[in-house]
Design a protein with these regions (language model features):
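Pre-Walker A-like glycine/lysine-rich segment at the N-terminus of P-loop NTPase domains
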Residues: 2-7, 14-64
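Nucleotide-state sensing region of NTPase/ATPase domains
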Residues: 67-140
Length: 140
């Protein structure tokens, strides 16, 4: 379980918005140990705290998959699918995030449909709802 926390400091620290790139919302569906997860952020630093197996690294892996490459664990894309204790069949997985940039916000997403997991294990990338090559993530 992930909890939200706030740390008070006597010294206010602000990020210059002309350089800031940050995730304001992230949604995971069928990804690793998450059936559904929706988190919203305000641009402040985030600390993930929880017991072993709570999903901290899985959340970081989800963020890393919104950049070009194979993610921080370099896992096979078919392994990213959440397997339910009730059913071992794949149902697809997705990660989407609203990313704030100096040029304005955009929506980025990646995932696999269930039929793609068994046929051709390649994840799809979408930016603002349009299919894109993986390198398009680096251009934003």
């Amino acid at each position: 379980m992930l909890y939200s926390a706030s740390i008070q400091s006597s010294e206010a620290r602000h990020v210059d918005p002309s350089f800031a790139v940050w995730i304001s919302a992230i949604n995971l569906t069928g990804f690793r140990n998450y059936d559904q997860l929706s988190l919203h952020f305000d641009g402040q630093p985030v600390v993930l705290v929880g017991a072993n197996g709570a999903g901290k690294t899985n959340l970081m892996e989800a963020v890393s998959l919104l950049a070009p490459g194979r993610g921080l664990r370099r896992a096979n894309t078919a392994q990213l699918q959440r397997r339910s204790p009730v059913s071992a069949t794949a149902a697809g997985w997705s990660i989407s995030a609203r990313i704030e940039t100096p040029e304005g916000p955009f929506q980025a997403g990646t995932g696999m449909r269930a039929e793609d997991i068994s046929e051709k294990p390649r994840r799809q990338i979408r930016i603002d709802g349009v299919d894109q090559p993986q390198m398009a993530l680096a251009e934003r």
